[in-house]
């Protein structure tokens, strides 16, 4: 039996000079450590600025952050991104992207609930939370 695919996700935008670089650095530096815990995982960074974050800009951002094949950067229409943000309850004050908050979402597998982590995570904390999510679902 193949192990289920786990998901880690965050909302970012490439022109952000405050929290996004820190969040992206955690994913970047955590890639190898996560793979040692559970090699079937995917990371997604979803842009909240689709007008600016073109696929080319996201590809350049991914390269700057040494994104592996497990880490995908997504964009879409403003309406579609809004739907995803509402589904994860990550709306921000006055629809001003500068007010967005650092959230990380984990899901051990497709039948598991999403786990929302508010605030910044170090690489060690990200790996720790990932282990807990996997153990709670009997995946690790």
Name each model-derived stretch.
Residues 11-29:
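Conserved redox-active cysteine motifs that mediate thiol-disulfide chemistry
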Residues 18, 56, 82-83, 124, ...:
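Alpha-helical elements of the RecA-like P-loop NTPase motor core of helicases
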Residues 127-140:
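Non-globular targeting/processing and membrane-anchoring segments
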Residues 23-73, 77-84:
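Structural microenvironment flanking redox-active thiols in thiol-disulfide oxidoreductases
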Residues 1-3:
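Short, small-residue-biased leader/transition segments that mark boundaries at the very start
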Residues 67-125:
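Thiol/selenol-based redox catalytic cores and closely related redox-interacting motifs
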Residues 8-9, 43, 104:
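Hydrophobic beta-strand anchors of alpha/beta hydrolase catalytic cores
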């Amino acid at each position: 039996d193949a192990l289920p695919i786990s998901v880690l996700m965050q909302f970012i935008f490439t022109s952000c000079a405050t929290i996004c670089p820190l969040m992206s650095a955690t994913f970047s530096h955590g890639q190898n450590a996560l793979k040692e815990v559970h090699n079937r995982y995917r990371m997604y960074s979803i842009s909240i600025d689709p007008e600016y974050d073109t696929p080319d800009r996201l590809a350049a951002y991914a390269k700057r952050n040494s994104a592996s094949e497990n880490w995908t950067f997504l964009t879409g229409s403003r309406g579609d991104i809004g739907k995803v943000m509402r589904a994860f309850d990550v709306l921000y004050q006055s629809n001003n992207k500068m007010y967005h908050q650092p959230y990380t979402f984990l899901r051990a597998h497709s039948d598991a609930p999403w786990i929302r982590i508010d605030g910044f995570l170090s690489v060690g904390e990200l790996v720790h939370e990932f282990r807990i999510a996997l153990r709670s679902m009997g995946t690790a």
